[in-house]
Amino acid sequence: MANYRSTIRHRNSGSRKSVSGDTHEVTRVRTPQKDRNEVLATVLNLLGSKRVTLQCMDGVVRMGRIPGSKKKRMWIREGDIVIANPWEIQDSKADVTWKYTRPQVEWLERKGYLN
């Protein structure tokens, strides 16, 4: 049994790739769509319980909610750029629908989406 575990550990040890040295060109970036009422936002605070404080590009500070389907896949930290979808009923709240990676944020800055 010990031999089996050591071979698996040895076989999988080289499968990790370093992310820090990986520089690749961004070809397609999802942009906020006005017809879906989407807006770019920056995460100010993590409030806990799937809630964050967002500073939206339209000048409104909203409480954002991370839907349960995206909670495990989308790890959000302070300072991240996200797409928020404001609620129709309450304008002070929004759903977080997309999180940008670092190369995508650089692309958005170059193209003028972020002020």
UniProtKB/Swiss-Prot annotation:
Keywords: Initiation factor, Protein biosynthesis. Residues 22-34 have a biased composition (Basic and acidic residues). Residues 1-34 are annotated as: Disordered. SUPFAM superfamilies: Nucleic acid-binding proteins. The keyword Protein biosynthesis applies. HAMAP family: aIF_1A. Belongs to the eIF-1A family. This is Translation initiation factor 1A 2. The gene is eif1a2.
